[in-house]
A protein has these predicted regions:
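Loop-to-helix junctions at membrane interfaces in multi-pass transport proteins
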Residues: 1-9, 43, 84-98, 129-263
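Helix-loop-helix module between adjacent transmembrane segments
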Residues: 6-112, 180-184, 270-279
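Hydrophobic residues within alpha-helical transmembrane segments
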Residues: 14, 56, 103-106, 125-129, ...
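Membrane-embedded alpha-helical core segments of multi-pass
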Residues: 17-23, 34-35, 111-115, 130-141, ...
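A generic alpha-helix surface/boundary motif
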Residues: 24, 36, 71, 75, ...
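Juxtamembrane loop-helix boundary motifs flanking transmembrane segments in multi-pass membrane proteins
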Residues: 30-38, 45-52, 109, 117, ...
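Re-entrant/interfacial helical elements at transmembrane boundaries that shape
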Residues: 280-287
Length: 287
């Protein structure tokens, strides 16, 4: 519902991560202590009981977060299959969604358990390359199909209030926007998928460089999916397809992308899915 106003999430992630990269606040001190996780620091600072409590809270948050990503990834695959092959039962059955989720999770579990850290590093790099190609092609085809200026014009027509399209303070309010900045900062410091990488690097200076470069990727990974979602909304004239907004983007991609490019994009999204979950499995194993 926020359209281009939702870009503020990526912008704040950029600002927060860039600030950490420049100053080294918190993360450099943690690296100097040579801890491998936030709960390990809790034990040094507060004692074993606090470490256990902190680990439990992080594990609960990780399970809930991973479950959300798992379902969204399966919905994307479900939407692609339903739109491409016209299989109605794929679109309607919740049990099929569970089967897709299980298959995807088993795939990730197998190569993560068998390959360990090396498999995660190598596959994450390959998946990043494939994902970058897929997203760039999807953006180019979206602009070609809809027209650059037409995207903005149509969005202002379809939106109930044109002011809400660009201004997050209008669409969400100042408190929510401020909270997003705090959330971006805290996530970059204590969330295991971010901090585990930092604490595994060879020196505090390398940690700062990692955050500096990561700030750019944080911005891009929020903006491009949001942009594709906006294009899907415009393509279907603001009508929710199948009663589920999560189905709009995969159905939109099936409509506008040629067969070969669609295959690259599906591979890219599966790569993003697998990259997320193998990192989650590895990072939460340190907790």
């Amino acid at each position: 519902n926020d359209f281009f106003a939702a870009f503020h999430i990526g912008l704040f992630a950029l600002v927060a991560t860039l600030f950490i990269g420049i100053t080294g606040v918190v993360v450099v001190k943690l690296r100097e202590l040579k801890v491998k996780s936030i709960p390990e620091y809790y034990e040094i600072r507060f004692g074993k009981n606090v470490r256990i409590l902190g680990a439990i809270l992080l594990v609960i948050g990780g399970i809930l977060n991973m479950g959300l990503f798992l379902k969204v990834g399966a919905i994307f695959v479900q939407g692609i299959l339903s739109s491409t092959y016209g299989i109605s039962w794929v679109d309607e059955s919740e049990s099929i969604l569970s089967i897709i989720m299980t298959i995807l999770l088993v795939m990730v579990l197998l190569y993560t358990i068998l390959g360990g850290m090396i498999s995660v590093i190598i596959t994450d790099y390959i998946q990043f390359v494939v994902l970058s190609i897929g997203l760039i092609l999807s953006v180019l085809f979206s602009v070609h199909t809809l027209g650059w200026f037409n995207i903005f014009n149509q969005l202002e027509i379809l939106a109930s209030n044109p002011k809400l399209v660009y201004d997050p303070f209008q669409s969400r309010g100042g408190f929510y926007v401020s909270w997003q900045l705090v959330l971006g900062f805290v996530s970059a410091i204590i969330w295991p998928t971010a901090i585990t990488r930092a604490l595994s690097l060879k020196s505090p200076e390398t940690v700062k460089k990692q955050y500096l470069w990561s700030s750019i990727s944080f911005l891009i990974r929020f903006m491009i999916p949001c942009f594709l979602g906006i294009c899907a909304f415009i393509y279907f004239n603001g009508k929710v397809v199948g009663g589920d907004t999560l189905m709009m983007m995969p159905m939109y991609l099936v409509e506008i992308l040629p067969v070969g490019v669609l295959g690259i994009m599906v591979a890219a999204m599966l790569a993003a899915f697998m990259s997320t979950h193998d990192s989650y499995l590895l990072c939460w194993s340190t907790i």
